[in-house]
Amino acid sequence: APTKTFNIAGMQTAAVAVPNPVIRHKVWRALNTDEVAEPNAFAVDVAVAAFTKGGNWLDELRSYIKENKTTVIEYIKEQIPQLKVVPSDATYLLWLDCRGLGSSASQAAERIREATGLYLSAGEQYGKGGEGFLRMNIACPRARVLEGLERLKKGVEILCSDVQK
């Protein structure tokens, strides 16, 4: 689907490619049963335009997000040593190892949110193996990333002082 890649979620467009004819028929039936098989009036044109004319924009976006990622990694390494950024290849969602904070990821996310207004997702909500990790979205303007990092630093300082009490 072009929706996340090109930031056109409001168009509610996606494509399904199913090579196996038996499975394709089952998918087709399910989509039609749920009445989600018909695109809105703009969806097809928007999707085609995104895929055929959005290459340069997407390259610039990837570069910008990569710079955001570098900014986050350097900031956390220098300013918030209690956290570690999990290495990743390609995503605008970063996983932060918060096992050094002395509380669960859920508790950390909640306390940081209460103290600073910064919303991070606790890894537990994504299944087994997510315990001890926070998820951070960096697909936003750099100023917002920097503001989020300042809030994160403040939240971690507060959380660490709470744990020491």
Regions found by a protein language model. Give the residues of each.
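PLP-dependent class I/II
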Residues: A1-K165
